[in-house]
């Protein structure tokens, strides 16, 4: 539930992802942010937007992407900011949120879009010419779908969606393409590839709260898990089971389809012929365990790929994880 905020927002940490989709937009956003928020003390890290701010912290030394990202986050939160602003895509915001939650840190977040898709929900502003004033921002509590190992070790949070598949969307030469998820997660390599016909191995099983779910689709092209807490599908029967979610504890949904939904590849299914899919709703406390996924299938959380140990994963819905600021 949104409400007017009286929280102080004087000390604002900024992280800009130079590798996100719309790199040229980031300098414009940083300039607009400083002009729009003159009352805030903005600071950042060199190489991550900080060099364009008056208060700049030293950047990380050479290392893997996530190692450098962690260094940047540590530097930013050490000053105990009132707000963390991400400039980039949904993946940048999700990495930052996941980093905070893994450490039980609570810092309100505000996302400015300069990435591939900028779907949200952390990234809520996409126009650098129309950034809201600080007093126009209100806080909102946000949940996520969490992916864990079967024995309960955290893997990732999906605030918009958590996809099980072998590909993820990204940008190359200004074009949206599908990259191999495993290559990016395990090696940091960007290789364009096609979606697997099925993400389920020969011994694939699904189990909700200890009960085995029968396989009803001829194959599993992709699985998408997402919260629906931001949506209101009341009475919209065309959305399937989602029309039952408003006003109930069931605020997350799992959708399994015979073809990949999140892809650049074209298919006549659903446009010229029927597409088959199945839905399952989740409430807090539910546990969906998937075993026997095909080799190199990953969890892709808001565009960020994660390796699944042993080809198994546990999915659950966690409400009220994060405070996000949005335009009133």
Residue ranges and their predicted role:
Residues 22-24, 91-97, 118-120:
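Short glycine/serine/threonine-rich phosphate/pyrophosphate-binding segments
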Residues 114-241:
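Catalytic core of DAGKc-family lipid kinases
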Residues 86-87, 112:
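Structural motif
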């Amino acid at each position: 539930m949104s409400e007017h905020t009286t929280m102080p927002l004087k000390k604002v940490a900024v992280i800009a992802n130079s590798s996100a989709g719309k790199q040229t937009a980031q300098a414009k956003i940083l300039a607009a942010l400083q002009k729009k928020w003159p009352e805030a003390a903005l600071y950042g890290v060199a190489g991550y937007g900080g060099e364009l701010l008056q208060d700049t912290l030293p950047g990380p030394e050479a290392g893997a992407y996530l190692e450098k990202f962690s260094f940047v986050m540590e530097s930013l939160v050490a000053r105990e900011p009132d707000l963390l602003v991400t400039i980039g895509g949904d993946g940048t915001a999700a990495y930052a949120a996941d980093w905070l939650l893994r450490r039980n840190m609570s810092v309100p977040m505000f996302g400015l879009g300069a990435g591939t898709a900028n779907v949200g929900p952390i990234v809520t502003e996409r126009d650098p010419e129309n950034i809201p004033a600080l007093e126009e921002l209100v806080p909102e509590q946000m949940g996520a779908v969490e992916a864990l190992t079967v024995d309960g070790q955290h893997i990732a949070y999906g605030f918009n969606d958590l996809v099980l598949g072998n590909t993820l969307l990204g940008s190359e030469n200004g074009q949206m393409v599908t990259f191999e998820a495993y290559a990016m997660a395990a090696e940091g390599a960007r290789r364009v590839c096609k979606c697997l016909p099925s993400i389920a191995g020969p011994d694939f099983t699904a189990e909700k709260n200890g009960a085995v779910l029968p396989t009803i689709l001829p194959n599993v092209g992709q699985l998408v898990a997402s919260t629906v807490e931001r949506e209101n599908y009341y009475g919209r029967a065309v959305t399937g089971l989602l029309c039952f979610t408003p006003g109930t504890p069931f605020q997350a949904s799992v959708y399994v389809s015979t073809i990949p939904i999140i892809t650049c590849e074209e298919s006549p299914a659903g446009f010229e012929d029927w597409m088959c899919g199945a839905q399952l709703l989740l409430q807090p406390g539910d546990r969906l365990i998937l075993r026997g996924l095909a080799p190199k299938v990953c969890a892709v959380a808001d565009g960020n790929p994660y390796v699944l140990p042993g080809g198994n994963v546990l999915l659950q819905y966690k409400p009220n994880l994060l405070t996000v600021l949005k335009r009133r």
